[in-house]
Amino acid sequence: MTPETIVNLQKHPIEDLNYTKHCKAKLDLNGALVMENFLTDESLDYLQYESRELRNLAYFCHQDHNVYLLEPDPDLPDEHIRNLAQTSDKGCVTHDQIPVNSPLRTLYEWPRFRGFLEAVLANSIFPYT
């Protein structure tokens, strides 16, 4: 798969400057950016299959924390977001375990996608080694 067949560029023209500005404005306003149907159906189906195949290589982690990943603050009310615990369960597969021809690796290494993320986040992005 090529980057152009992985990303739904009809709905998410990440190389369009106006679209990028719109995404940044939504992120700045809401604190989150939801990009529904960002991946094409074909690439999403394949990535789900691939993740099931790689599951045995994943490192799994369970954590209880607040949204800030900080210790609770006794000076704030109990119902303050800083003092509300949530649970995270995740499984991570290291970069070197992801097949070279994986759509995930293709997207991760695509310079135009990285440029879009850097513009929206207003920050540099560096790949893991």
Where are the language model's segments positioned?
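N-terminal auxiliary "cap/dimerization" subdomain that precedes the catalytic jelly-roll/cupin core
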Residues: 1-80
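Signature of the catalytic double-stranded beta-helix
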Residues: 39, 46-58, 76-129
